[in-house]
Structures are given as C-alpha cells and as structure tokens.
C-alpha cells in the first residue's frame, strides 16, 4: 500500500541531502515536490496545500541541532504531520450498549457484507465479544446468502428473515433476538446506496432511528481515491456517521482517501481492510501508517500479528525438537502455515523497516506457499521425518505428485537444509550466549 507515494516522498527528501541547514529556499523546493507527490496520490488539493504550509511553518521555526541533518528533521516533521492528518491516534468503536449495535452503511461494491463478517470475527477473537450478524440487505440478489456463508465460516450466529422485505423491521427483530439470546454485539449489514438516492437515504435514516446504533460505520473502497472522500462527505451530511472503514487498502498504491478523509469529513478512520482473508481487518493507527508511508516499517503491528498466532505449547515443542536436532519437514510445514495466518507476505514485508523498499520490485507471491505445502504433503511420513533419505527417484515421485518440477523440489530441500543448519547453530553455546544477551522476542523459543 502507498508504494507510489512512499517512493515520491523519498525522492523529495533527497533535495535536502548535503544541505547544511534548513532555509526558506530549500524547504520551499522540497515541499513543492512533496505537494506534487500528495496530489499525484489523489489527496484533496486543500488538504495537500494546508499540509505543506504547516510543515513549512514548523520546519522554519525549528532550531536545528548540529547533530540533526536538515533532511532528517524534515522527515520527522512530515511524519508527525502525516499522523495528525490521519487523526493523530487510533479511535476505538463504541461498544457500551447492551447489546452494542453497529450499523454498516456505504455504496454498492464497497465491501460492506464481507466487512461485516470481518468485524464480527475481529470482535469475537480480539475483544471476546459475542456478536450477532443481522442481514438487512433485501435488494441485492444473494446478499443474505453471502452473509450466511460468511457467518458459518467464522462461526458467528446470523439473524435472517427471508419472508420480510422491510429492512427496518428486520433490524428491530435482530436486536430483539440478540437481547433474547444474550449476544452482546449486533452488526447490521445494510444495502448499498448512493447519497443522491432519496428513497434509500430515507430508508437508512429509518434503520438508524429504529436500531439506535452505538456506532454507525461508513464503509468505503480506498481504491476509489478522491471519489471515496466526496462520497463520505455527502453521506455524513445526511447520516452523521461515527467513523470510516477503508476497504481494499492493500491494493491502494496512492493513498489519497486515507490521507484526505479525516480532514474533509471530520470523522476518524477506525478500521482498514488489508486483504481478502477474513482476518485481514486492522484497527487504524495513524502513527503506524505514517511510519509505513515514510518507509519506516511497522514493527508494532508485526509483533501484534505474531502474538495473535503465538502458540506457547507449539513453541515449547519446537524448542525441544530444535535442541535435539530433530527439526523435520513436519515442523517446517507447521512454521509456514503459521506465517500464512499472519497475512499476505508483501504486507508483512512492508512492516519491516527497509525490507518493503528492498522488495518493491520483487513479485512476492503468496501462492508460492501452496507449492511448498504441496511438495511436503506429497512426501511419505517417513520422508518428512527423515529428509536425508530423499534420493533422486523419491524427489521425482514427489515432484510428480505435487505438480511441481524436480528443480522446485531440490530448491525446497536446499532451503530446508539451510534452515535446519541455522536451527542447529542456535543450539550451540556461542549462540545461546549471544541470544541470552538479547531481549526475548514474542513467539521465539528460549534457548537453554
């Protein structure tokens, strides 16, 4: 995400490289380039101008320490202003109601129904909530069925009334169902609509009046850029929602919507969709997003994702196997499957400082994992436990069974051997000593 903007901003800061101090001339030249980068990223013109004016005022008002280079200072100011532009800090959703009612609204095709399922899963897994999905989209063919399938997939209950064509009535019934059965959160999925469609706008207002939601979220496709911002503004004038959810942010290389929407609409971005998986919904953290835009990574989010997938018993089991030099293809496969649960690889790479930039021209394909899994699953249990018995004929059989080539099998075996050697090194006394001086990372087995 934001790849184009990150690259352009990096080039802009190079204008100050070699400068001894910040002056009105070199700042003006740099910020002119920054403004162009923001406009090319589809940021609202007034927002871009106001942003660069604020950065300029702060940069010229700074007493620069001799140890701080002008370019470094400007990056710091731009970072802080970017974070403020996007809201300054994360804004939580209101879950105080009994039950807490969340109303989802937005355009057709923005991804409301999928987002409703993702939000239910996030609240269930990360907040310990007991959500109920309510299907109020009575217009789109198969909308109710789509939500039902998602509810089944994430193991969350759903309220449907296939006989009723009144979404206001269905919303009331769904909330009554939640109270009767002890669900503490109700997520109301509604039909997509345009702000200029008077009849449908009156309908969503009626649903809001009937449901009395604690939180009304406007779901918008980040890839529509400035159109998303304008639509959000029109909707807010009619509906007065509480926050924005940006979907498809992983596919948005420009970032205009994320950078403009808080200022133009005066409502916070609360969540962002970062992929197709049901787990790919994150709380929006402006500071972390500013880090990523400026190529500084997002280690905090990376560690949080790792902690979510951390299994202490599995880590201890792996630790014992490493210490006994028993690491095999079964363990290798388990580690790959754990990484897959954390999200798509390109997104994970962008969270590590410097790595996202280094790999910007590399095609990071999550499907590569499928090939690795196919190869390992085509091995016999004995071959997985004893990789040393993999001779040429066995490898040819594995390649045929997995639909891959002998070269791919050889490459995987080589990668596995390198991983196992590294694991063996980690059990050595020298490595133990080195690791003992380092703070323990979440998810990493301690070496004894």
Model-assigned labels for residue ranges:
Residues 135, 162, 188, 219-220, ...:
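Small/polar loops that bind or transfer phosphate-bearing groups
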